[in-house]
Design a protein with these regions (language model features):
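Conserved small/polar residues in nucleotide/adenosyl-binding loops
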Residues: 176-180
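N-terminal glycine-/serine-/threonine-rich phosphate-binding loop
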Residues: 2-71
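Ligand-binding beta-strand-loop-alpha-helix segment within the catalytic cores
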Residues: 9, 19-35, 95-169
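Glycine-rich beta-strand-to-loop/alpha-helix junction loops that act as flexible
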Residues: 73-78, 174
Length: 180
């Protein structure tokens, strides 16, 4: 049996009908066995634009009711196109991030958040430094704490997330070895 066929699957060999349903009925037929709703796009750019649009809509909905939008983000390479589109929306469409709170999904240990190789530093360079988010609304794990305090620190990090009502959207990265 062959495994790892994902590199051999191309959408130009598959009719769009099988991944781009024309109506709700077709979508229900295609997705009836899915446990997690999944959309397939013809390009990474098209997918990134849709994700950015959905994030922007959530931010705007929260703004309308005077609430924070809580995002959990990563500094990896996978969401780079999403961040680029959100920056474009901020610059050209005046999407504001003033009501956004960001929790960094992970950090390397032992590494300070401002270290050149830190996940948080990458997230700032790719995205956060280019939008109008309040720096007080940025949270990241401290990679410099003592090992014997990590468990307690993680509990406090989760409590901080809960204090803002939980996470509205988590944008995960995918590494080539199928890690998420």
């Amino acid at each position: 049996m062959k495994t790892n066929l994902s590199s051999q699957i191309t959408l130009n060999r598959v009719s769009p009908r099988y991944y781009k349903p024309e109506n709700a009925f077709e979508k229900s037929v295609l997705t009836r066995f899915e446990k997690i709703p999944t959309d397939i796009f013809e390009s990474a750019e098209e997918g990134a634009n849709q994700i950015a649009y959905e994030i922007a809509q959530t931010i705007k909905e929260k703004q309308k009711v005077g609430k924070f939008c809580v995002l959990a983000l990563t500094g990896g390479n996978s969401p780079r196109n999403v961040y680029s589109e959100l920056i474009r929306m901020h610059q050209q469409e005046k999407l504001s991030f003033r009501n956004v709170i960001v929790f960094n999904l992970y950090e390397y240990y032992p590494l300070a958040p401002d270290a050149v190789n830190s996940n948080f530093n990458a997230l700032k360079e790719m995205f956060l430094d280019h939008v109008d988010i309040d720096k007080q609304n940025l949270f990241t794990p401290d990679g410099t704490i003592a090992k014997d305090t990590i468990f307690e620190y993680c509990k406090l990090y989760e409590q901080r997330i809960a204090s803002f009502g939980g996470i509205d959207i988590a944008l995960l990265g995918k590494i080539g070895r199928a890690h998420v």
